[in-house]
UniProtKB/Swiss-Prot annotation:
PROSITE patterns: AMP_BINDING. It is an enzyme of class 6 (ligase). SUPFAM superfamilies: Acetyl-CoA synthetase-like. Coiled coil: none annotated. This is Probable acyl-activating enzyme 4. One of its GO terms (biological process) is fatty acid metabolic process. Belongs to the ATP-dependent AMP-binding enzyme family. The keyword RNA-binding does not apply. GO terms for molecular function: ligase activity. It comes from Arabidopsis thaliana (Mouse-ear cress). Expressed in roots, leaves, stems, flowers and developing seeds. Its EC number is 6.2.1.-. Keywords: Fatty acid metabolism, Ligase, Lipid metabolism.
Length: 545
C-alpha cells in the first residue's frame, strides 16, 4: 500500500467556500439572510457573492491574489456576504471591529496593507478620518455598505468612496468562476486580536484551518439542516466563531441584528422561531435580567464563551427556555476548540455539584487533536488532578498559520515541541476536562471585546502624574470582566483623582477600553526582580465593589 500516493482526484484543497455553492443548489429558494425588510434566498446570496468577487477580481481594481480586503460593519447581510465574496476573489478577508477609534483603525489598515475597505455608512466618517492618517500612496479605496432603510440618499463624503456596495455588486459578472485556493494552506482570513498599538497582533488563518474550525462548529453543536440562527455575536469576532460559514453548510436562516437590544432580541426569537444563537456571557446576563424578558415559545440553543456564566445566570436562562452550552477558544483557533460536553450522570448530582461540573470549560471538540495543560518551563504535562496549574496548550487543524509580520511572536507561541501556547492558565481534571483558572495576563474580555492591558497601560504611562501602572481584569456580573487600573503616582498630594485618570483615558482610547476602576497604591507589588505581580492585583480587584 505504500505505493498508493495522493492524487489530484483525492487531494483537493479544503475550503469552506464551496458550502455556498452547495447551499444555492440544495436550499436555493430558502431564506438565507433577513434584516429589517431585506430578505435574500440562498440562490440570491450565491449570485450576489459571485458578483462581488468578480468585481474585486477585475483588472480595473488591481487587487491581486493574497492581498487584503477589509470589512468594517455590524451584522448586516452585506457583511455576511463578504465573508464568502472576498476570499472567493482570491483576496484575504480582514474583519475589523467598528468600535475602534480612528487612530487604532489606521494602525490596522496600515499593518494589514489593506487595498480596499468595505465600510458601513454609520462608520464612514470614522474610516475617512482613519485613512487621512495614512500616507496617500498607502490609502485603500473605500466602498460604502448601504444595507437597510436608513442609508442617506447622498453625502458630502460620496466623492471619497469608489462606489456603494450595491453598485459594486451590479458591476460584477454572474458567470464568474470563483478562485479556488491552489493549496489549502493558502491564507484566507486575517483577524486582529485586541490590538491598537504600533505592533498589533494579526492572526492569519488558512483555508484549511477555517474549514476545520467550521466543521468543528457544526459537529460540536449538532447543527441541523435549516436552523434559524440569530446573529447576536458580532461577525467581526473571529468571523462569528466560524458560524458565518457553518450556517451556509446547513442552509440556515440568518437573522441579522446590528446591536444587542433585549426587547428586539426577544421579539425576533418569537417572530422567526429562532433555534440557535451565540452570545457573550454579558448578553445572557442582559437577557435574563431585563424587564422585557419572557418565557420562550420554544427552546433556543445558546453557545457562549469566555468566562463561564455564573450558575445563577444559567439557571435563569434555562428557566426562560434557553439551552446553554459554553466553551473556550481564541482568535488563534478560529473558534471554540473546547466545549463542556454534558454527561448523563451529571443529572443525578446535587444542583451545586452539577453546576460545578458544568462550569468547567470542558473537553476538546471532536475535530480538534489535543488539549493539555503543561509546565511552561519544562514543557511537561502537569498532573491531571484538577489542582496543579499550568499553561493551556493546543494542537489541532484549526490553529492559525501564525501572526502576520511577527515571526518572533509566532515562534514564541508555536514552539518547537509542536504545541501552541495560549498564555492562559488552567488545570486538567482526572476525567480530561479542562478548567481555565486565569485568562491571559494581557487580555481583559469585556462584554466579548478583547482589551489589551498592555495597550491601556501604555496610555496610562503617558500621564505625567503616573509613575507606575498595571491593568488587570475585574470580574463583573454584567460585562464578564472590566479593566481595572492600579497606579502609583509621582506625587502623593491628593491632586489626582480617579475621575481625572478616566477622563484622560477617554481622550486617547475607545470608550470600551477606558478602565471602570482606578485604584491608587503607593507602590505596585513586585517580585525580587522588579516585575509587577499581577496575580496579586487580580486578587485585589476581585474584592473591589
Amino acid at each position: 500500500m505504500e505505493l498508493l500516493l495522493p492524487h489530484a482526484s483525492n487531494s483537493c484543497p479544503l475550503t469552506v467556500l464551496g458550502f455556498l455553492e452547495r447551499a444555492a443548489s440544495v436550499f436555493g429558494d430558502s431564506p438565507s439572510l433577513l434584516h429589517t425588510t431585506t430578505v435574500h434566498t440562498w440562490s440570491e446570496t450565491h449570485s450576489r457573492c459571485l458578483r462581488i468577487a468578480s468585481t474585486l477580481s477585475s483588472a480595473s481594481l488591481g487587487i491581486n491574489r493574497g492581498q487584503v480586503v477589509s470589512v468594517i460593519g455590524p451584522n448586516v447581510p452585506s457583511v455576511y456576504e463578504l465573508q464568502f465574496a472576498v476570499p472567493m476573489s482570491g483576496a484575504v478577508l480582514n474583519n475589523i471591529n467598528p468600535r475602534l477609534d480612528a487612530h487604532a483603525l489606521s494602525v490596522l489598515l496600515r499593518h494589514s496593507e489593506s487595498k480596499l475597505v468595505f465600510v458601513d455608512h454609520h462608520s464612514s466618517s470614522l474610516v475617512l478620518e482613519a485613512v487621512s492618517f495614512l500616507p496617500k500612496d498607502e490609502r485603500p479605496r473605500l466602498v460604502i455598505l448601504n444595507d437597510g432603510n436608513d442609508m442617506p440618499s447622498s453625502s458630502s463624503a460620496d466623492m471619497d468612496f469608489l462606489d456603494t456596495y450595491e453598485g459594486f455588486m451590479e458591476r460584477g459578472d454572474l458567470r464568474f468562476k470563483w478562485v479556488r485556493p491552489k493549496s489549502e494552506w493558502t491564507p484566507m482570513v486575517l483577524n486582529y486580536t485586541s490590538g491598537t498599538t504600533s505592533s498589533p497582533k494579526g492572526v492569519v488563518h488558512s483555508h484549511r484551518s477555517v474549514f476545520m474550525s467550521t466543521i468543528n462548529s457544526l459537529l460540536d453543536w449538532s447543527l441541523p439542516n435549516r436552523p434559524v440562527y440569530l446573529w447576536t455575536l458580532p461577525m467581526f469576532h473571529a468571523n462569528g466563531w466560524s458560524y458565518t460559514w457553518a450556517t451556509a453548510a446547513v442552509g440556515a436562516r440568518n437573522i441579522c441584528v446590528t446591536r444587542v437590544d433585549v426587547p428586539t432580541i426577544f421579539n425576533l426569537i418569537d417572530k422567526y422561531q429562532v433555534t440557535h444563537m451565540c452570545a457573550a456571557p454579558m448578553v445572557l446576563n442582559m437577557l435574563t435580567n431585563h424587564p422585557a424578558q419572557k418565557p420562550l415559545q420554544s427552546p433556543v440553543k445558546v453557545m457562549t464563551a469566555g468566562a463561564p456564566p455564573p450558575a445563577t445566570v444559567i439557571s435563569k436562562a434555562e428557566a426562560l427556555g434557553f439551552d446553554v452550552s459554553h466553551g473556550y477558544g481564541m482568535t488563534e483557533t478560529g473558534g471554540l476548540v473546547v466545549s463542556c460536553a454534558l454527561k448523563p450522570e451529571w443529572d443525578r448530582l446535587e444542583p451545586d455539584e452539577r453546576a460545578k461540573q458544568k462550569s468547567r470549560q470542558g473537553i476538546r471538540t471532536a475535530v480538534f487533536a489535543e488539549v493539555d495543560v503543561r509546565d511552561p518551563i519544562s514543557g511537561k504535562s502537569v498532573k491531571h488532578d484538577g489542582a496543579t496549574v499550568g499553561e493551556i496548550v493546543f494542537r489541532g487543524g484549526s490553529v492559525m498559520l501564525g501572526y502576520y509580520k511577527d515571526p518572533e511572536g509566532t515562534a514564541a507561541s508555536m514552539r518547537e515541541d509542536g504545541w501552541f501556547y495560549t498564555g492562559d492558565i488552567g488545570v486538567m481534571h482526572p476525567d480530561g476536562y479542562l478548567e481555565v483558572k486565569d485568562r491571559s495576563k494581557d487580555v481583559v474580555i469585556c462584554g466579548g471585546e478583547n482589551i489589551s492591558s498592555t495597550e491601556l497601560e501604555a496610555v496610562l504611562y503617558t500621564n505625567p502624574a503616573i509613575k507606575e501602572a498595571a491593568v488587570v481584569a475585574k470580574p463583573d456580573k454584567m460585562w464578564g470582566e472590566t479593566p481595572c487600573a492600579f497606579v502609583s503616582l509621582k506625587y502623593h498630594d491628593g491632586s489626582v483623582t480617579e475621575r481625572e485618570i478616566r477622563e484622560f483615558c477617554k481622550t486617547k482610547l475607545p470608550k470600551y477600553m477606558v478602565p471602570r476602576n482606578v485604584v491608587f497604591l503607593e507602590e505596585l507589588p513586585k517580585t525580587s526582580t522588579g516585575k509587577i505581580q499581577k496575580f496579586l492585583l487580580r486578587q485585589m480587584a476581585k474584592s473591589l465593589p
